[in-house]
Amino acid sequence: SNQVLRLGVSATDSTKLGAYQLDTVDESVAPDDTHASAKTALNALFDATADYVVKGTFGTFTASVDAGADARDVASSFNLISGNSGVQATALTRAKMTVSAAATFSFTLEGKSTTPSQITATITSTTDLTAIKDAINAVSGSTGISAALTSDKSGVEITQAEGYDVIIGDVTTGSTDANLVVTAMDMDGTLDSTARTLDGDGTTGDSTAIVGTVRLSSQNAYTVTPGHANNIFGADTSELTASHNTISSVSLTT
């Protein structure tokens, strides 16, 4: 008796409590022949200005996104109107790498800096990609890309935390059997259904690019309507409705 029960909430932002969320689609460029051509193909995905109309109980506002914008730019545009709309945006670019055979892998990697970094790593077993992970982390100061091994070490998960596009190009291994396989991931770590196999023979199909993901979140219901078919929510201009992400469990301790 006479005990005081104190209840606390450790997080109050809309991405952690029950919220209305809307994510962009996972997208990557089909294998191209060079780093430069993969970058060109990436830019062509969003080659037009695309304004996004946000509607909700707060009213109607427009996030203006320029042609060629990456996920970071899109998130910034939504956050510029978040004070009025109540819809906040975060951006993240993620992908997973695996290899088909042991070899010395060499490839270019571009993220935050527009100057690609050179990655070289010797892999002696497809079940241990530590060398690729270490080589990517060694240039993270330039790319803003961090790398971590999967639990079984057979994969490397890369993250560009600011939402810059990631370009992986000009893969060479000196072998037609040793390829680099890249798969885009969403914010929650779910792999895209399409994996990009980059040929290691140094001729064609050795480059790709990963588009970042944007997550919109608000405590109130809302819709988003893209103003152009070439947009990061998919090739459509239909109105999109945010899904309600409810709180799954509450734990009380005394």
Outline where the language-model segments fall.
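Polar, low-complexity tracts enriched in small residues
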Residues: S1-T254
